[in-house]
């Protein structure tokens, strides 16, 4: 984003009940089931959801205790937790078809460590990390507030309150912010479309949604009343997988930085941490966030690249966007590689990724989340190397 002048920037989010997010949730549910049984299981699970039908497909390598029957039960529990018990999509009677097979031996031989050969990357690719000072979470403000609006609406829906009972699981948000010299100063428009029951009126929904927006946005940031769009097309009763088919991995911009930073193209959900699409994107965020937390720069974009079967990154690139505080970017790249082993194994061990921690990542963004110390999740959001970075640059 530009550092000078005035401009508008927009990001969107979708709720856990959006069809694509239902698919992401189920794929990560399968992943967590395998990692719970075997921390070194291999999983690449894709999910399709549509009217009363769920299809799982992909490749796995793990213990026989993870049976199709177990995965079907976990799939139904995930759908129930999201809140779907509707005629067109219900946890009780949706058809669940499971088509998972063994991981390709050709892929496994490139990834597995043998003898003196360290574990290789599960595929080639480029991954990006980003951090900035726009929010306390060091995330871009438009995506941060888009997520928060939907998270609050979901909390309300699941609260059992009178207002919450009017809401159904499928929802989307979109926040447009005005920037002055690279800093957000207020919202110019907010769009929220939320699925609802037949009994809900548009006036009631508007009151509920506007109240949540007011709770989420900073003081003085509310857009004009006429620029708050709630269910702009009117009725939104039929939603979720009954309204639109959903697929794993179709919300990669929602999952990351809302378009404020580049994206390498790889999705996250359903992939075990040997897949650098996921693990390297996590460590890239971790490194970028620690640079900003160390006050070495106000905005950081970081790129890492890998080749399948190769244990070290082919490149590490850091861009401080002119916001560095007397920091040499080449030295910073070298320092980051010294502080964190960026091999696939090194990333997994540093961030403790071989655990069943992925279901919570499947909605409301993989980044900008608050780590739960009891669960030891979202470890890539910790800023535990910021002090070492400051020391390396004599701060």
Curated annotation (Swiss-Prot):
UniProt keyword list: ATP-binding, Cytoplasm, Magnesium, Metal-binding, Nucleotide-binding, One-carbon metabolism, Potassium, Transferase
GO CC list: cytoplasm
Cofactor(s) this protein requires: Mg(2+); K(+)
Amino acids binding Mg(2+): 20
Main location (coarse class): cytoplasm
UniProt: ATP binding residues: 18, 170-172, 235-236, 244, 250-251, 267, 271
GO biological process, one term: one-carbon metabolic process
Residues annotated to bind K(+): 46
Enzyme superclass (EC): transferase
The record's free-text note on cofactor binding: Binds 2 divalent ions per subunit.
Pfam families in UniProt: S-AdoMet_synt_C, S-AdoMet_synt_M, S-AdoMet_synt_N
Annotated region described as Flexible loop, given as residue ranges: 103-113
Compartment list: Cytoplasm
CDD domains: S-AdoMet_synt
Recorded catalytic activity of this chain's protein: L-methionine + ATP + H2O = S-adenosyl-L-methionine + phosphate + diphosphate
UniProt pathway: Amino-acid biosynthesis; S-adenosyl-L-methionine biosynthesis; S-adenosyl-L-methionine from L-methionine: step 1/1
EC number(s) recorded for this UniProt protein: 2.5.1.6
Protein family per UniProt: Belongs to the AdoMet synthase family.
Subunit and partners: Homotetramer; dimer of dimers.
Protein name (database record): S-adenosylmethionine synthase
Source species of the chain: Granulibacter bethesdensis (strain ATCC BAA-1260 / CGDNIH1)
High-level lineage: Bacteria, Pseudomonadati, Pseudomonadota, Alphaproteobacteria, Acetobacterales
Gene designation per UniProt: metK
């Amino acid at each position: 984003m530009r550092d000078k002048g005035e401009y508008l920037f927009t990001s969107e989010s979708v709720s856990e009940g959006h069809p694509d997010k239902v698919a992401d949730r189920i794929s990560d549910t399968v992943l967590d089931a395998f990692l719970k049984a075997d921390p070194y299981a291999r999983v690449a699970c894709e999910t399709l959801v549509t009217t009363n039908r769920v299809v799982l497909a992909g490749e796995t390598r793990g213990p026989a205790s993870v049976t199709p029957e177990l995965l079907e039960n976990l799939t139904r529990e995930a759908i129930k937790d999201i809140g779907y018990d509707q005629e067109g999509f219900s946890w009780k009677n949706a058809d669940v078809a499971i088509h998972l097979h063994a991981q390709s031996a050709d892929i496994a031989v490139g990834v597995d460590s043998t003898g003196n050969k360290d574990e290789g990357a599960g595929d080639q690719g480029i991954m990006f990390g980003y951090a900035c000072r726009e929010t306390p979470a060091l995330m871009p403000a438009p995506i941060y507030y888009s997520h928060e609006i939907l998270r609050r609406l979901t909390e309300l829906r699941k609260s059992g309150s009178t207002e919450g009972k009017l809401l159904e699981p499928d929802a989307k948000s979109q926040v447009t912010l005005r920037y002055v010299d690279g800093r957000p100063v207020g919202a110019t428009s907010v769009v929220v479309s939320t699925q609802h029951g037949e009994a809900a009126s548009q006036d009631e929904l508007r009151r509920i949604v506007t109240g949540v927006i007011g709770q989420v946005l900073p003081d003085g940031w509310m857009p004009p009343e006429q620029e708050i769009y709630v269910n702009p097309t009117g009725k939104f009763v039929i939603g979720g997988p009954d309204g639109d088919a959903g697929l794993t991995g179709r919300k990669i911009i929602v999952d990351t930085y809302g378009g404020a930073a580049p994206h390498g193209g790889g999705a996250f959900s359903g992939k075990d941490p040997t897949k650098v699409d996921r693990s390297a994107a996590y460590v890239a965020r971790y490194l970028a966030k620690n640079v900003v937390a160390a006050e070495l720069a106000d905005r950081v974009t970081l790129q890492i690249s890998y080749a399948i079967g190769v244990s070290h990154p082919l490149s590490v690139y850091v861009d401080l966007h002119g916001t560095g505080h007397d920091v040499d970017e080449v030295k910073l790249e070298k320092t980051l590689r010294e502080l964190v082993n960026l091999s696939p194994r090194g990333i997994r061990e540093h961030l403790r990724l071989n655990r069943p921690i992925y279901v919570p990542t499947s909605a409301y963004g993989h980044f900008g989340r608050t780590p739960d110390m009891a669960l030891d999740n979202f470890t890539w959001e910790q800023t535990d190397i910021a002090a070492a970075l400051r020391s390396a640059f004599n701060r």
